[in-house]
């Protein structure tokens, strides 16, 4: 079982510089005796079999640096800050059915729509805000990969990650029934076949924002995320770039070692209420038993959840609640409620990825966390309003900022 207190004690012992590491050894021995060994990262259950060479990394040999040293006079000019996603991108095939067939049965789809999913909408949302955006994950070779590459080209999203030439990118069948249920059947492909060196070629510069989504934490690519997080260190103030992590309620599939490394890196955490409760439970954070009623205690519950979980994480935290807005907490500070923007719920898929993408884009432009959250709230609301086939569509920058201005004007 993951023990957040042991993780923080281990980090404190390492920072103290105890050369004989007696404290570290004692803590680790205690942790091993009290709980089972952390689970290892297991390969993705993929039906795509590699038959050729391994993934070919993109030509970006320089590693991230936190030295802060001035560049030599002959060094090339630094590029603008950009959003870099370590998430996975695949294709969803959405099928509307009356009901799921029984085993061996048959069902006809009323409507079938292929759409790019995973971290794609977050990437698109960042790019539409005018921020340079890059994808560092793996893309394969085949019809699904070609669909993704075309979308990247069309929207000026740069792919800087490995290209796997012996396997196509995977896809998901998403069955939407008339009762509102969603059933997923996944075929994992190149996107899930990463390793510890997957993100070694990512070239980070001051001001960049690295986005990590939960879809890259639960298969073989998780080893690459872990390696990246470990080299990023545990002091966010020493990093010239920011890390934004968006977990989901599927945290039980993230192994203990990776979760500990993520917590110790102290990124900016952003999630909805369900994922926040799941994370708090996994970390052993205290949860106040505040009933959610129409009388207004929802706000109190969200504030308490954000405060308790943020205190446990010792890192910036955003908890989203759709049109109700978001609750933001900085380490050592009070919880701030950022108003949302009411909209009619016509979507079948979450607007959380749009929120995360715009949040990252605004952080890359130098906005504060609260300011970035306000803009992201507006973008998520508009994306629901613009939904196509139940899928939120990221809005353009001008429309988002206009909504933010109208919201600010209405408060005065």
PLM region spans:
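Structural motif
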Residues: 84-86, 186, 209-211, 244, ...
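Short glycine/proline- and charge-enriched loop/turn segments
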Residues: 99-108, 286-290, 336-339
